[in-house]
Amino acid sequence: MVKNQAQAKKSVKRKQLKNIPSGVVHVKATFNNTIVSITDPAGNVISWASAGKVGYSGSRKSSAFAATVAAQDAAKTAMNSGLKEVEVCLKGTGAGRESAVRALISAGLVVSVIRDETPVPHNGCRPRKRRRV
């Protein structure tokens, strides 16, 4: 009986809503998916969403519309914790780069800086084979 009460107390604990006025939005746009994670300036994740989490699967995950829906979902949950102003860090060359930024602005977040942090190899790994259609 004591174990059940201890477990009940653990499950009652919830995340406390913090009032975070500014943060950083990391958008990773690959050819297969788009992942949007919103952090505070220290790097602790406030909310995140991806095209797969929002409900798209297969080739629809790589669309620009799926990235828009994912960015709006992440922005909505972050704004509940008091987020107003964000910096945007873009990574990757997928279809959802610009549409994710537009969705953040339309959700009501103020975008102060947009940075492109796409990793560019200085002749590192061998690229995948070319498609022959």
Swiss-Prot record:
Q: Could you say which residues form the signal peptide? A: none
Entry keywords, A to Z:
Ribonucleoprotein, Ribosomal protein, RNA-binding, rRNA-binding
Q: Name one Pfam family in it.
A: Ribosomal_S11
Q: Which PROSITE patterns match?
A: RIBOSOMAL_S11
Show the HAMAP family listed in the entry.
Ribosomal_uS11
Record NCBIfam families: PRK05309.1, uS11_bact
Q: Does the keyword Ribonucleoprotein apply?
A: yes
Keyword RNA-binding attributed: yes
Q: Which GO terms describe its cellular component?
A: ribonucleoprotein complex; ribosome
Question: What biological process terms from GO does the record include?
Answer: translation
| One MF annotation (Gene Ontology) recorded for this entry | structural constituent of ribosome
Output this protein's name.
Small ribosomal subunit protein uS11
Record's function text: Located on the platform of the 30S subunit, it bridges several disparate RNA helices of the 16S rRNA. Forms part of the Shine-Dalgarno cleft in the 70S ribosome.
Checking Gene3D superfamilies in the record gives: Ribosomal protein S11 (3.30.420.80)
Q: What interactions and quaternary structure are annotated?
A: Part of the 30S ribosomal subunit. Interacts with proteins S7 and S18. Binds to IF-3.
Lineage top rank: taxon: Bacteria
Q: Which family does it belong to?
A: Belongs to the universal ribosomal protein uS11 family.
Q: Return the InterPro entries for the record.
A: Ribosomal_uS11 (IPR001971), Ribosomal_uS11_bac-type (IPR019981), Ribosomal_uS11_CS (IPR018102), Ribosomal_uS11_sf (IPR036967)
Q: Which organism is it from?
A: Chlamydia pneumoniae (Chlamydophila pneumoniae)
User: Disulfide pairs?
Assistant: none
